[in-house]
Amino acid sequence: LEKFHETNYRQGQETQGIKKEIFYWALEFATEYEFDNNSFIYKLKHKIADKLVYITIRENFGVLELIVSGGAAIQPRLARFFNCLGLRIFEGYGLTETSPVIAVSTNEKGGRKVGTVGPPLAGVEVKIDSANNEILCRGKNVMLGYYKAPDLTAEVIDSEGWFHTGDTGKLED
């Protein structure tokens, strides 16, 4: 996503005059994208930016309508940019030990929020260790243990069955 954004930015820099100004305005507008902003002025600005800039960028994606990311957190500016273009970004979180997803954003109202990964999947429990803000989870998706390594398993799965991810986080409503 970063490289695609950079490529489009460079292409915009090569334009001249009013086209360049409109391009920069549309990019700036995209960095302020809000999922649930329904004001008339916001919608009008978005429609103008879409007709003048975003539609051309979106053509590079063909029929692609959504992107699911889970390898690393997406920078908020990129998440806003691609969502503003009309390419829905869904962020997920998990580890190999959790087969591999714990939580993923959804398409429901309020289900996607920049900088978050969404609610836990059905059947997955998540909590935050108050001592160090570590993300803990348990569910049928979590491994039973490391193969022939009970000592390693005991380091990451406690007596109540909570898998300690080693990552820090927080829960939001």
Describe each PLM feature range.
Residues A103, V114-G115, E160-G161:
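Short, intrinsically disordered/low-complexity patches at protein termini
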Residues P120-D129, N133-D173:
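Conserved ATP-binding/catalytic segment of the ANL
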Residues E2-R112:
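Gly/Ser/Thr-rich phosphate-binding loop
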